[in-house]
UniProtKB/Swiss-Prot annotation:
Protein name (Swiss-Prot/TrEMBL): Large ribosomal subunit protein bL27
PROSITE patterns per the UniProt record, alphabetical: RIBOSOMAL_L27
Entry keyword set: Ribonucleoprotein, Ribosomal protein
Domain of life from the UniProt record: Bacteria
Any one Gene Ontology BP term: translation
UniProt keyword Ribonucleoprotein present: yes
Keyword Acetylation belongs to the record: no
Gene Ontology cellular component annotations, sorted alphabetically: cytosolic large ribosomal subunit
MF annotations from Gene Ontology: structural constituent of ribosome
Length: 85
């Protein structure tokens, strides 16, 4: 057994709190206006029809409806909310 702590061990032992990013509502789910759909850093997914974008790039529903993830060109994605019929 070591009688000294070892060089690294006293400098370790920290970790940042998780930011809880990612998808909060999936395709086909019904949402109400104001519901958060996606939390992200930067625009991984762009806002589509009836979806707003917050200052931290959080995507949220502007109307009640159904979530649909779509392609925006060849290399981008967008999320839209369409009214549920």
């Amino acid at each position: 057994m070591a009688h000294k702590k070892g060089v690294g061990s006293t400098r370790n032992g920290r970790d940042s709190e998780s930011k809880r990013l990612g998808c909060k509502k999936f395709g086909g789910e019904t949402v109400k206006a104001g519901n958060i759909i996606y939390r992200q850093r930067g625009t991984q997914i762009h806002p589509g029809t009836n979806v707003g974008c917050g200052k931290d790039y959080t995507l949220f529903a502007l109307i009640d409806g159904v979530v649909k993830f779509e392609r925006l060109g060849r290399d981008r994605k967008k999320v839209s909310v369409y009214p549920a019929n």
